[in-house]
Design a protein with these regions (language model features):
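Conserved S-adenosyl-L-methionine
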Residues: 84-97
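Conserved SAM-binding loop
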Residues: 1-66, 70-77, 120-121
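Amphipathic alpha-helical segments
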Residues: 80-81
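General N-terminal targeting signals
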Residues: 70, 93, 102-104
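Short secondary-structure boundary/hinge segments and terminal tails
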Residues: 64-65, 97-99
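Core SAM-dependent methyltransferase catalytic element
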Residues: 99-124
Length: 124
């Protein structure tokens, strides 16, 4: 059940969300490929409140319902660098190695193992 003290619902096409605290980690799976590039600022500002960021992304040609922003990992590394995030190759590999998310499903559905990325916020 929805508890407003634990969850925040926000439409990032309307602008950034205001957060009044920091977080240890942001876990973002199956999101960025569904958001037009013009709205990246709106969610990146929220992510700046997180010390660590683990995310997935869809690659060009991967396909999927409402995939409007399929990009290679280098794109996300460059974009997130502009918002203060340093890509960690070692933590990305650790994330992919240890994930159990969807590993029992078809290989294409193993989102973290296939296209997981890990970043550290250099400003927190």
């Amino acid at each position: 059940r929805y508890n407003p003290e634990r969850f925040l619902i926000h439409d990032f096409t309307t602008g950034p969300v205001s957060l009044d605290r920091t977080f240890d980690v942001c876990w973002c799976v199956e999101f960025v490929e569904h958001v037009y590039a013009e709205y990246i600022l709106n969610f990146a500002v929220a992510w700046q409140q997180c010390k660590n960021l683990a995310m997935t992304h869809a690659t060009p040609g991967q396909g999927g319902y409402h995939h409007v922003n399929e990009q290679p990992k280098e794109y996300w590394i460059d974009v997130l660098d502009q918002y203060g995030f340093d890509y960690s190759e070692s933590m990305t590999e650790e994330l992919k190695l240890r994930t159990t998310m969807n590993t029992h499903k078809k290989p294409k559905k193993a989102f973290v193992r296939n296209n997981g990325l890990y970043f550290k916020n250099r400003n927190l």
